[in-house]
Every structure is written in structure tokens, then in C-alpha cells.
């Protein structure tokens, strides 16, 4: 009697129209982003509750919110699916790019909601430019995503995301400690080095996303 030969299962093929986003969205670690969202909502609601929000307080809160939301999104790139999928028709860079879009888009939506609430509490006529502040948030988000995309190439689990958070917070702290002449976080909207700082942020903003694009490439085997 001949023993049936054991065949290696063929690579999983994703048929046309096979939904990838729902299982990918379920696989993302949303807990850090949910925790930061609750923190942002609580802090914005409780700061000077029942009174108008001072412009400098609102600016500080939005910067803290943008930094923490970027840190939380780093956890979305920890890909537990990679060990289970084996050979698959869906490249790693596609899965990781979708993770960036899903979690990053959610973080931006949360930040915009927080900005709208903060804006509604400011006194009439207060300068609070959404475009400039969104550039700051995009820089924090891009650095966190790029660092996380790099870290998960060398480590697995939450320790990779934590390494990315350390990199992001370290870079933010380094820019805060710069001399006043090159300060990148002016304390008052529209005054001092505000325009120059945001011209710098705008010019540098493509760099972390270019870094992210390189880090999302498929791993060489």
C-alpha cells in the first residue's frame, strides 16, 4: 500500500472582491488610540470647564493631543497577521499601508474633532489656524508611523511600537529644547517665529513619509 503524499498547501490567494479591510481592521490594536482619545476628550472638557478656553491653553492641548495620537497610532503597525498568513497574495506592504491609512485616518479625525471643540470654546476673534496646527500634527504622526514601520521589521509585538514611541517623543523633546531663535513650537499663534517655524514644518513634512514609504517595503527573505 502506498502512503499518500503530503502536499504543502498552496499560497493563499485573495480572490477578486475578497474583503481585506474588515479582518485587518479587527487585527489592529486599537486600545492605545481609544485610551488617548478618551484622555484628549477628558482634558479638553475639564480644562477651565464652563469658561472660555485661553488661546495658549488650547494651543498646548492640541499639540499634546497630536503628539499622543501619533504615539498611539504606532501600535497599529504591529502585524500579528504576518505569522498566520504565511504565503499570501497580499504583500506585506499592502497590509501595512492599509494599517497606516486606517489608524492614521482615525487619529486625524479625532484630532479634527478635538480642534473643533477647542475652537468652539475660544473667545471670539482668537487666532487659531487649523492649517498650521494640522501641519504640526501631521509631522508627529509621520514620525511615529515611520519609526514604527522600521521597528516592526526588526522586532515583534508591542516592544516594537514602544521603540517607535520613544523615537517620536525623543524627537519632539529635542525640538522643544532648541534655542529660542530656532524654536519650532512658538507659544502664541501668529506671533514671534510662528510663520518661520511652520514654513520649516511644511518643508520637512515629506521626510518622515518618505522614510515610511521605504520602511513599508516587503521584507527580503
Regions found by a protein language model. Give the residues of each.
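Hydrophobic alpha-helical transmembrane segments
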Residues: 1-58, 149-154, 168-221
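Hydrophobic, membrane-facing alpha-helical anchors
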Residues: 9-22, 83-87, 112-122
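Secretory targeting signals
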Residues: 51-55, 61-67, 98-165
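Hydrophobic alpha-helical transmembrane segments of multi-pass membrane transport proteins
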Residues: 57-83
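Transmembrane alpha-helical segments that form the membrane-embedded catalytic/substrate-channel core
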Residues: 73-77, 145-150, 215
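Helix-loop-helix units of permease transmembrane domains in multi-pass membrane transporters
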Residues: 75-102
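Membrane-interface module
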Residues: 94, 121, 128-129, 213-221
Amino acid at each position: 500500500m502506498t502512503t499518500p503524499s503530503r502536499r504543502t498547501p498552496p499560497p493563499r490567494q485573495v480572490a477578486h472582491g475578497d474583503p481585506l479591510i474588515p479582518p485587518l481592521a479587527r487585527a489592529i490594536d486599537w486600545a492605545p488610540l481609544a485610551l488617548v482619545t478618551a484622555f484628549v476628550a477628558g482634558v479638553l472638557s475639564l480644562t477651565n470647564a464652563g469658561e472660555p478656553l485661553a488661546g495658549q491653553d488650547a494651543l498646548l492641548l492640541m499639540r499634546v493631543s497630536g503628539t499622543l495620537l501619533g504615539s498611539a497610532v504606532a501600535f497599529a503597525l504591529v502585524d500579528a497577521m504576518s505569522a498566520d498568513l504565511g504565503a499570501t497574495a497580499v504583500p506585506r506592504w499592502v497590509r501595512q499601508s492599509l494599517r497606516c491609512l486606517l489608524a492614521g485616518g482615525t487619529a486625524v479625525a479625532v484630532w479634527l474633532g478635538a480642534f473643533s471643540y477647542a475652537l468652539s470654546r475660544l473667545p471670539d476673534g482668537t487666532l487659531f489656524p487649523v492649517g498650521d496646527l494640522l501641519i504640526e500634527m501631521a509631522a508627529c504622526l509621520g514620525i511615529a508611523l515611520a519609526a514604527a514601520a522600521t521597528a516592526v521589521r526588526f522586532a515583534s509585538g508591542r516592544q516594537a511600537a514602544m521603540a517607535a514611541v520613544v523615537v517620536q517623543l525623543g524627537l519632539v523633546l529635542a525640538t522643544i529644547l532648541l534655542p529660542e531663535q530656532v524654536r519650532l513650537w512658538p507659544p502664541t499663534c501668529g506671533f514671534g517665529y510662528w510663520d518661520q517655524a511652520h514654513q520649516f514644518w511644511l518643508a520637512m513634512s515629506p521626510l518622515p513619509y518618505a522614510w515610511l514609504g521605504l520602511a513599508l517595503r516587503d521584507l527580503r527573505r
